[in-house]
A protein has these predicted regions:
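Bacterial N-terminal signal peptides
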Residues: 17-25
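C-terminal motif of bacterial Sec signal peptides marking the signal peptidase cleavage site
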Residues: 27-29
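N-terminal Sec-pathway targeting helices
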Residues: 3-17
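Extracytoplasmic cell-surface/polysaccharide-interacting catalytic and binding patches
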Residues: 31-42, 46-334
């Protein structure tokens, strides 16, 4: 955190003018906070995330206090998780659990259908559809447009060709959007333009990213797809969006951060996170360090394989956050 310089003013009027400018600056910052992801400088390795008005926030606790190890099985755990990279060089060999069908996510809180689907039996991981449903509800609340249609998710078990156009659909973490105009019966393409630009501009708030942006085709190896969205989770989607990183770039970006020197980040909802990378050991397992709180409880965290060479850990460092559910971890060491 930069040192705060202190100045003495001989002229009281000058001091009041400076104070007024500061107040106006803070007011402007607060008014735009909810709509803008907070940027992190990708060039400053192991540095703290840039925070709006950081002087008023408590410092994120360091991770070098009490901690424990979670034992990850490299053969299975490294190829599963919300942040797995699936592309032409890294195929999906993991498993998909906790799935759901799309139908119940097409309605608002009053039970009115506000979105449509190409099939009520479309299937994906539950967290993917939960993010889609929340985003769709907020889009409808803001734009009063009910033409969004989810067109593709996981391929059917007996359809060998349904995922050939995109590497990611097998993971249960991706879906494609289309449009359906019930008044005309037309099915326009989802281009993400006009009112629909709201989707790509706000999807990060729900843990979603536009997976194949127009300016990243040389990195992803896939032509731009304005309709294809991928669930990566919170706060990863916000970090990626703020720094204009596609998933390939984010996988490399996180490798600059370790358990000893993590990326610390305050999300748009003021939740404090620490994110770091753990390289997979050469053996069959990897001991992944995760921090404990002051009561020696495991802090809420997620551990995702990257499907390349290791694990990405995200820890909720906010005070009074609910402890992690240790029963979900298969093998732990104190």
């Amino acid at each position: 955190m930069p040192k705060v310089k202190r100045y003495k003013y001989k002229n009281i009027a000058a001091a009041l003018a400076i104070l007024l400018l500061i107040i106006l600056g803070i007011s402007t910052s607060c008014s735009s906070k909810a709509d803008s992801p907070k940027k992190i400088s990708a060039s400053s390795s192991n540095s703290s995330a840039v925070k709006a008005d950081s002087s008023s926030k408590k410092a994120v606790k360091k991770l070098t206090g009490n901690y424990m190890y979670v034992t990850a099985k490299n053969k299975t755990d490294m190829v599963n998780g919300d942040l797995i990279l699936v592309n032409g060089d890294h195929s999906f060999t993991g498993t998909v659990n906790n799935t759901d069908t799309v139908y119940s996510y097409l309605f608002d809180k009053n039970g009115s259908q506000i979105m449509s689907t190409s099939s009520t039996q479309l299937t994906a991981k539950k967290e993917t559809f939960e993010a889609f449903g929340k985003m769709g509800n907020d889009f409808y609340a803001d734009k009063k447009i009910s033409t969004l249609m989810i067109n593709t998710a996981m391929p059917a078990e007996d359809d060998e060709d349904s995922s050939s156009a995109c590497y990611e659909h097998d993971t249960g973490l991706a879906f494609d959007l289309h449009l359906y105009d019930s008044s005309t019966g037309a099915y326009p393409e989802f281009t993400g333009e006009g009112d629909y630009s709201w989707i790509s501009e706000n999807c990060w708030k729900y843990g979603l990213i536009l997976r194949y942006p127009e300016d990243k085709a040389d990195i992803t190896g896939v032509s731009p797809m304005a309709y294809h969205f991928r669930y990566v989770g919170i706060p990863h989607a916000e970090i990626m969006t703020a720094n204009k990183l596609c998933l390939e770039e984010y996988i490399d970006f996180v490798k600059d951060y370790t358990f000893e020197k993590p990326l610390t980040f305050t999300a748009f909802d003021d939740t404090e996170y620490s994110v770091y990378y753990v390289a997979a050991d050469k053996g069959s397992t990897t001991n992944v360090p995760v921090p404990l709180d002051d009561n020696n409880n495991e802090r809420p965290n997620t551990i995702s394989g990257n499907n390349v060479d290791g694990y990405i850990v995200c820890v909720n460092m906010t005070e009074n956050a609910a402890p992690a559910d240790s029963s979900s971890q298969t093998d732990q060491q104190a």
